[in-house]
Amino acid sequence: MLGKRKGKQRREYVPDYVLYDLETTGISSLYDEVIEISAVKVRNGKIVDEFSELVNPGRPIPYAASSVNNISDKMVENARSFEKVLPEFLAFAGDDVLAGHNIAGFDMKFLYRDCEKYFGQTLTNDYIDTLAIAKLCFPEWKHRKLSDLAEHYGI
């Protein structure tokens, strides 16, 4: 949802949330653009809905980004802009808690920026960053990538 105050980072379990991920043209929320947004809506541990859309960033996708996310200019040439896609994602998420890995340090910055840019308000949803939780649960680990967690839990 949109409003004047950003949502808070939470660390407690919530049964209902929207797990999401962004792919972008680079790592800077100042200069780079979203090229894909994907999400699942979870209710009591079960996926009940999905959202996924490629986004045309309005400029070429750098090779470095394409080599990481495997999204090419050809794939997004007929896609809509993030200005058109973002309202649909916001409607999908509603006022649910947002969740994802490293979203506090990355994904949320893009959402905050673009909500301000397109709507003049910020994203008010609370969020859970699984990277922050992994740091609390596994302080001795050198790395806490999503793949490390998946391997640890046999996923």
How should each PLM-predicted stretch be described?
Residues L2-N125, P139-I155:
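Conserved non-catalytic scaffold segment of RNase H-like nuclease domains
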